[in-house]
Amino acid sequence: MSNKKADSKPQAKYPVNLLDTPFPMRGDLPKREPQWVEDWEARGVYEKIRAASQGRPKFILHDGPPYANGDIHLGHAVNKILKDMVVKSRNMAGFDAPYVPGWDCHGMPIEIQIEKRFGKSLPAAEVMAKARAYATEQIEKQKVGFKRLGVLGEWGNPYKTMNFQNEAEEIRALGKIIEKGYVYRGLKPVNWCFDCGSALAEAEVEYKDRTDPTIDVLFAFAEPEKTAHAFGLAELPRAEGGIVIWTTTPWTIPANQALNLHPEIVYALVDTERGLLVMAEERVEACMKDFGLTGRVIARTPGEKLANLRFHHPLAAAHPGYKRTSPVYLGDYVTTDTGTGVVHSSPAYGVEDFTSCKAHGMTDSDIINPVMGDGRYIESLPLFGGLTIWDANPKIVDALKAAGSLLRNERYAHSYMHCWRHKTPIIYRATSQWFAGMDTQPAGGGKTLRETALDAVDATAFYPSWGKQRLHAMIANRPDWTLSRQRQWGVPMAFFVHKETGELHPRTLELLEEVAKRVERQGIEAWQTLDARELIGDDANLYEKNRDTLDVWFDSGTTHWHVLRGSHKDQLQFPADLYLEGSDQHRGWFHSSLLTASMLDGRAPYKGLLTHGFTVDGEGRKMSKSLGNGIDPHEVANRLGAEIIRLWIASTDYSGELAISEEILKRVTEGYRRIRNTLRFLLANLSDFDYAKDALPAGQWLEIDRYAVAFAAQLQAELLAHYEKYEFHPVVAKLQTFCSEDLGGFYLDVLKDRLYTSAPASPARRSAQTALYHVTQGLLRVLAPFLSFTAEEAWRVFQPQSDTIFTETYYAYPEIAGAEALIAKWTLLRDVRGDVTKALEEARTANRIGSSLQAQVEVRASGARYDALASLGDDLKFVLITSAATVVKVDAQGDESVDVAASTYPKCERCWHYREDVGAHADHPTLCGRCFSNLFENGETRSAA
């Protein structure tokens, strides 16, 4: 460079190293993202990731299947993007982390769609064919939506619960749990939807407010003498009266068969204008007020003394068909919070009622069960036959009144069970169903299903940790699992049952395997068309095909069997490392998967469970059509970019509710721009840098460059620890701070002078570029799991010879000698710089200086601050971005200060520094000596910055 002096002539404009990059400032995301999606598919990027990951330890995130019905909504986007971030971050952490997406394909919602389109009278074979076609069409539609969000996975070979192999394996799983002795058939009250005409799983029930009649009903004394003795009386002072119950379901009264009292609650005999009334003593005052009566307690007794007393059915006077009595059974579940402390018991329509009546010797055939599957009473029911239970409610109230049994009738607003699909009220209804027994021991002995599942919960890692207690409580308190459904489009419970006894065929296990083989070839349709004689010969005279299908929660709940160890066993493995779903899946997929794996394997199918919250608007309200506050992910992707949705999800603490609004998206977009601008600066300043030829070893870097790389490496270690625990929002927060403050607000700000004004190939500039290269290598990789489109776009500019960033692992930064001490020193220097910046700002406000380069500063410092500042020598001015800087030692911290003065020297046209040597070379009157040297001689020497 020394021979340049000969060529030096005055120039109209002196060159600086201002470089450009094909990485644009504007992301133009809605236009460019779909091109990346196409590019990834065309070049087989997912397959390349798999090839690059081969032989590494596996990490399996098992996809909880969305239902193959309808467009994807924001909740889907949250779920799929979180999964994508987990999978990408695990791949980059050095695992082989495949992602096989899946779909739940059977069940009611699809049947409803087929009914809507084609009516209810289609033959079964046509329902099946149309349901398969519909599910396929929905899957393709959803698949496009998921890919548009930047989610990479095995889209060409997803799992579907309706694939023949999966259907067959599900039947085999059923065979296994029968073999282990968990399955039984019984009459039991189950959640029943009249519109579905089927039992519902717990997860298919939601609660909504509704108003129902609330009535207090008198059951007249049937055994007055025994009642008197129970109360310690010789006889009752009068014959009229009885025991009083309170209910919000008048429709259950025709099926009443018992009364429940708490053994330890004290019951009172109250003398009133309506006769003698029996109720809990602590409810007397409230009830008298409600009934408009005055009453006097004449005797008291604990509930246990009233056990087995009988009272007349309250409709006995209305119709001879109700001339029966109801016995008193004791139950610990009776409370005195509301009502009378007496519960009327219709065992066909309440779980506790059923359990209590069965415990007192009632058989299935004794149970009165007049409500049919469509919600109507059987025709033979006295007074109300043929009516729906809802239409019958007011008529039952009228009949009770006419019979003299009604004490009070009001309307009552309460939270009540509804079908999640039809949004209509449901009931408990005793039906003959197939169950998995929660308190059943397996055939070979050992722990019950409930005990095994609770142990499995204890052995599982939960993110966030409160999920453990929630799932534990659900398993501890849940009833037996109703496995059967009364539908067509579902995997059959392919049993042959005895026409008279209902017993399973003795060869059931062998027959299930035969059916599974046929289903493997032809799908579940094979069972529909099967003639029983083909498999059981003349036994077909005694046995018939069971018509029930499996609960769809069994379909998805056995994917650990028919996907992880079935259709996709080559890609996946059991148990999965992680299941990741919304918090509603504690009673849904997490729950059913846990129960099936506990039955099949005696353990959970997952090592960890991650739960995310639901989306709400900016005011914390749930998204709903009525509020009009829903946000469509397609619309946001097409307007702002899927990257903005991804960044919003990554930056939100998903363990709670995820708030979204236009204001929030605006803030996210601004945050995105800051990151993008940082990347653009890095790429532009590396555009003339070839690492192989131009990089310097760390020992030759300037001190601030060593600090920057040491700091970036330390930050990366923190980020990877967050990634390992699936904590994304701290990753985003720290990276945004890194880009805006550590890089933009400090390091890159200091670096600009050296990058722009040093000779292009000078050691000072190459030192800066080498550091920037390492920072960019690291930064793009830690951004890639959530800013996938942007990281890939930047990577193609940065490393054009590389196929994709997603085959990379996290960057191994070069070792920096004394990194810890270096970071501590520069943290101190940045602290001082903050004080100087403040002083410069005050001087600017007072119009003493224009830009900071117009200033010369004197920093008075003590102790370690002085040592750190003094060690920079003349380079201190570059760190403070002033034209001159001196440091003066003082003894005490209290004497420290920053003095700012305006420079009296002229301004260099090229570097904008105010220097005494501007114009020192007559041929270049507007250049300072530093710029002259950098342009025409050997260039300035720097050591620190």
Swiss-Prot record:
Highest taxon listed in the record's lineage: Bacteria
Cofactor: Zn(2+)
UniProt-listed PROSITE patterns: AA_TRNA_LIGASE_I
Chain location of the short sequence motif 'KMSKS' region per the record: 622-626
InterPro entries reported for this sequence: aa-tRNA-synth_I_CS, aa-tRNA-synth_Ia, Anticodon_Ile_BEm, Ile-tRNA-ligase, Ile-tRNA-ligase_type1, Ile-tRNA_ligase, M/V/L/I-tRNA-synth_anticd-bd, Rossmann-like_a/b/a_fold
A biological-process GO annotation: isoleucyl-tRNA aminoacylation
Residues annotated to bind ATP: K625
GO (cellular component) term, any one: cytosol
Alphabetical keyword list: Aminoacyl-tRNA synthetase, ATP-binding, Cytoplasm, Ligase, Metal-binding, Nucleotide-binding, Protein biosynthesis, Zinc
Catalytic activity: tRNA(Ile) + L-isoleucine + ATP = L-isoleucyl-tRNA(Ile) + AMP + diphosphate
Cell location: Cytoplasm
Positions contributing to L-isoleucyl-5'-AMP binding: E581
Protein family (similarity comment): Belongs to the class-I aminoacyl-tRNA synthetase family. IleS type 1 subfamily.
PANTHER family the record matches: ISOLEUCINE--TRNA LIGASE, MITOCHONDRIAL, SOLEUCYL-TRNA SYNTHETASE
Domain free text: IleRS has two distinct active sites: one for aminoacylation and one for editing. The misactivated valine is translocated from the active site to the editing site, which sterically excludes the correctly activated isoleucine. The single editing site contains two valyl binding pockets, one specific for each substrate (Val-AMP or Val-tRNA(Ile)).
UniProt-recorded name of the protein: Isoleucine--tRNA ligase 1
Organism: Burkholderia mallei (strain ATCC 23344)
